[in-house]
Amino acid sequence: MLFILSIVILVFTLWAIFYFQLSRNSGAMTLIAVSIVSAFISPWSLILGIPLIVLSIIVMVDALRMKIITQPAYKALSQAMPSMSSTEREALDAGTSWWEKELFMGAPNWDTFEQYPYPTLSVEEQSFLDNEVEQLCNMLDEWEIHHKHKDLSPETWQFIKTHGFLGLIIPKEYGGKAFSSFAQSRIMSKIASRSLTAAVSCMVPNSLGPGELLLHYGTDEQKKRYLPGLTKGEEIPCFGLTSPEAGSDAGAIPDTGVVCYGQFEGQHVLGLKMNFSKRWITLAPIATVIGLAFKLYDPEGLLGDKTKTDYGITCALLPANHAGVKVGPRHHPGSPFMNGTVEGQDVFIPLDWIIGGVENAGKGWRMLMECLAVGRGISLPALSTAAGEMTYLNVGAFARIRQQFKLSVGKFEGVQEVTSDIASETYMLEAFRYLVTCGLNQGGKPAVMTAMAKYYATESMRRVVNHGMDVVGGRAIQLGPRNFLALTYQAIPVSITVEGANILSRSLMIFGQGSMRCHPYLYEELQLLQAPDKDAALTQFNELFYHHLGYTFNRTARAFAFGWFGGSSDAPQQADEFSRPYYKTINHFSAAFALTADMCLGLLAGDIKRKEMLSGRLADIHAQLFIATAILKYYAHGQKTADEQLHAQLALDKALFNAQEAFFGLFNNFPMQLAAGVVKLICFPWGRALQPPSDQLKRDVAMSMMQDNAFRQQLKQHVFYNTDPDDVFGRMESTFQSLTEIEPLWDRFKKAEAKGSFDGLSFVEHIADALNTGAIQPEEASQLLSYNAQRFDSILTDIFDMQLEQTLPLDNPHLIEPLGVDTEAHPPAASAEPKTGGTAQLATDHHKEDPEPFIRF
């Protein structure tokens, strides 16, 4: 018994040293002292005590530590790490980090999190949304754009140019708007809610392109030359990166620029002879200025460095009408935004056309990655959020309006399973947008966060829109100007593919970049492992390596405590009874992730980049933790209504459950099962801590989605909202609002109708009978007839001529004049004889005290 007590004391001491992060010497001396004391309790404890004493001495004595631990570790890790190409290095090095680093490191600082300023719109930004963006949306008809004009109208293009839609990111000194990241996101979302084609056309110049590159890297002369024109729309930009041989592997572009002398504007100057063939370039067919990525070579050393011939990827800016440049023809990417080719053979340009001048030769890939790190966090997530919001509004309305088997389709549990998913995913998308743009508004280029935003937002959009198609069925399949969902569905592949293909982003980039940017020691360790001066590197590595070990053991201690005894109760001060349990789970999972990530990095080393499924699961864990914190912050700044809490609860339950499942998927598939089993035992000793969201929660959220709830009201502020019954969106929305107003009357009438309470075969005959028997009043009959006609119109799909070129008029047999009451043939309801046979007696007796006199049994 004393032996067990002494062992427990030693283990607890070891845990406390790491949990409370004692210094190396303090921890070692404490461990030696406790080992000696434990030996007095039970001499058998020296079985563990002696190794701990020896290890403590090694840790305290630098020479011993270097000889016994550091040198062997340095040698083994140097051999295990594969060589890294300059392109890989630049991609992984690019950008900065933000809140995602706190979550990666396993000890999120909630005070820091709470102090992040929540994004809001300035007066100017709000005015632009309410006026210019609203006007633009009124000009757009996505069906006409898709199937007739194959482009925005000339009037629309002119409006976009005149009102500065192409210069949202450009500083005011050049005539731009200088809007915040949050404002850009809101603007793009609102445009996308009306037309994805218009949104993409406005998005690209404000994302990765000449404007962004010039802002950050251009010379003063280049900025003065191009930025005012880009702002006014006098210049239309595009950027050529991808080519037939290089899509996701854009670093392998075959396009070249060779340093040589040539003729330019009548002078013999040093420049570049360029050969390029670019594909899938948005806005290329109408561009006036082209950004190009190419590989720069200097075989003759004309730039001054005779030893350097291969400079790597470089970016330059060319006028589209420059000699030898061929722009066009168009591609057809499933949506009619301008997209095409850019080609050139033996095109000579002066060196000062390199973005940033010759000093930036070879720095193009890092420039692109850093600009992409910002743009991909705004543009495609904004489009995804808009798609989610419009699907929520339209499908929620449809699910309430559309009846099958005499019941609104949204009340069937099978439908509720997917509509609840639409609701929670839309809530997540909006929350995600707020936190990501909050980070971007802080400055910096958080590459990992924006890679998460692009991947998880577009994947969420894919699920939401697919669910919407399932619910709406034939109404969403039949194309035409009435279809509110199909064109969004067609655009999914574009969002999934561009600005970082989703498979690549999840399986390689998110955790690959995350480990470089978010781990406190890994990046510096890798630099030292690959340093040419091994002796100098070893000295630095010795200190850094022990900091890393201390970090790992601290996270192990935290993960153990949280896994066995529950997560830390640390949370922001604004946390309430609803949110505190979620913060506790995040604390637990964050510590578990830090330990799991170190296990993968330490044991797999360079093989981690080939274990893409494991890397994808690590990305899932990291991202779902970030998403959960985004939802919590969004909820904290929201109205906290019962409906909003339902949305937040389902979104949080899904995010954290998905993170947990990624943990267990990784443990089950890790190649070294013993190590995975130990980490699993430390982090999840009781098995899965979370259950999937309950069916009842899904039902509640699905029912809320069919109501005009507070979250739905908020979404209306973020999209182009209208109730025009002849509009593709307004048709469903106006019908939904009409049903909201008369639903008690409608439901009572339909229930009575289902029980055979009325004579006649049609709805109109039932109305006439109910009216003439006094079961309903003339005003109610008018309301029922009007809504029924509106309801029928809302579910109609378009019809076309045989060539599918022109839509044809639709017949709505329910559009009739309200029926009158034959008072002579049918006496008032109070004296009407009730129908027999167990059916409901329908009468409205205004003289009896009955709050619900419409149906009596």
What do the PLM-derived regions correspond to, one by one?
Residues 10-17, 27-37, 48-205, 212, ...:
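Amphipathic, small/basic residue-rich leader segments at the start of a protein or domain
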Residues 267-325:
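A short core secondary-structure module
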Residues 323-348:
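Flexible, small-/acidic-enriched active-site or ligand-binding loops
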Residues 341-376, 393-410, 434, 555-580, ...:
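A glycine-rich, basic-preceded beta-loop-alpha segment at the flavin cofactor/substrate interface
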Residues 414-441, 466-469, 623-634:
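Loop-to-helix element that buttresses phosphate recognition and phosphoryl-transfer chemistry
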Residues 444-476, 645-659:
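Charged, glycine-rich active-site and insertion segments that engage polyanionic ligands
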Residues 465-489, 666-677:
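A glycine-biased, small/acidic residue-tolerant capping/turn segment at secondary-structure junctions
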Residues 560-572, 577-845, 849-857:
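C-terminal amphipathic alpha-helical interaction region
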